[in-house]
Amino acid sequence: MIRIPRGTQDILPEDSSKWRYIENQLDKLMKLYNYKEIRTPIFESTDLFARGVGDSTDVVQKEMYTFKDKGDRSITLRPEGTAAVVRSYIENKMQGIPNQPVKLYYNGPMFRYERKQKGRYRQFTQFGVEAIGAENPSMDAEVLAMVMHIYESFGLKHLKLVINSIGDADSRKEYNEALIRHFEPVIDTFCDDCKSRLHTNPMRILDCKIDRDKEAVKNAPRITDYLNDDSKAYFNEVKTHLDDLGISYVEDPNLVRGLDYYTHTAFELMMDNPNYDGAITTLCGGGRYNGLLELLDGPNQTGIGFALSIERLLLALEEEGIELDVEDTFDLFIVTMGEEAERYSVKLLNQLRKSGIKADKDYLQRKVKGQMKQADRLNAQYTVVIGDQELENEVIDVKDMSTGETETINLNNLVNYFQEKNN
């Protein structure tokens, strides 16, 4: 038997309704913030991620699914969404459209070769937003408010917003030099990844899963001590907006994002449930990127965004015992008796469905009792039984499956009857 690839999952019908509910809710929220959907290819040129995500990142070095196509071009299944959205922004000259900043959101599968664990998959579904064209602390605050709005709209309460400023390019340069001086004397005691990052991306040493508990990491210089006046002022204004919005947050000077393109504001949304088993910690992450567009040969524009995993959102809802208001019923199940009724039901079903009425019937020639059980299993709100007598008299009984009550109506009025019920 051929089995599903490791690190992937089948989303079965009983779960896909939850996914559709979440995706519909996210679409509705995006309209409130005036964000428009964008869809990019599942695969892109490998160079896009090497340049846009960063050669020194774990994503590029260890986790990408890369292959050569028949034209000998290096192609990669997208490991994240931002680089592709920015590529599309540049290629389609969106900086020239009248509505600025350009507010975009996306939702789709991403691919990373990661170790299988709860809440993490090698194919996962990422929802994200990107606001490009405005370097304004109020935009950063809006994006952070949107993050909180999303999770709170699903009923999650045990949330902790963690923020930091990585500063501008000048601040980061000075800070990276300080980190190199700090870690060089002890780098031999660190893992191979940290050793390779010391002179390429020393900030990543701070969030190394292997060495983050070392004293040298705990006592490392803090980015807040190296922010220039402009970076400090920007971050302070972001925090002022958050205070005005009543959004609680925690500052963590060691918070750095795993991708190279972040500047200024960086953030993560964490689980903060005392009963949580620790299987996942971070629900969502993002930040500002002020140099990414130029890095990809685009205009001198700034952006900010975030991404979240639908799988992790579902896991968080499960851990907090939150049931989604998923509609799993349909309007009508037709029970048939005899060949004439079976033939008539095919025509009737077609009329019902074309009129917007969710309806179904038996296809396995069950007896009436078995058909009624099937209607109950399918959560049909109503059933009708059609046999020779009903066809001859053109009268049927509509049964309410929740109350057991019946109502007798003209068979030819069945479509109108349910249209009126649905209005």
Curated annotation (Swiss-Prot):
Entry annotated with the keyword Transcription regulation: no
A GO MF term: ATP binding
Gene3D superfamilies, A to Z: Anticodon-binding domain (3.40.50.800), Bira Bifunctional Protein, Domain 2 (3.30.930.10)
Reaction catalysed by this enzyme: tRNA(His) + L-histidine + ATP = L-histidyl-tRNA(His) + AMP + diphosphate + H(+)
Domain of life: Bacteria
Protein's cellular compartments: Cytoplasm
CDD domains, per the entry: HisRS-like_core (cd00773), HisRS_anticodon (cd00859)
Cellular component terms per the entry's GO annotation: cytoplasm
UniProt keyword list: Aminoacyl-tRNA synthetase, ATP-binding, Cytoplasm, Ligase, Nucleotide-binding, Protein biosynthesis
A Pfam family annotated for this UniProt entry: tRNA-synt_His
Ranges annotated as spanning the membrane: none
GO BP terms, alphabetized: histidyl-tRNA aminoacylation
Protein EC: 6.1.1.21
Oligomer and partners: Homodimer.
Family to which the UniProt record says this protein belongs: Belongs to the class-II aminoacyl-tRNA synthetase family.
The protein's name in its UniProt record: Histidine--tRNA ligase
Species of provenance: Staphylococcus haemolyticus (strain JCSC1435)
The gene coding this protein: hisS
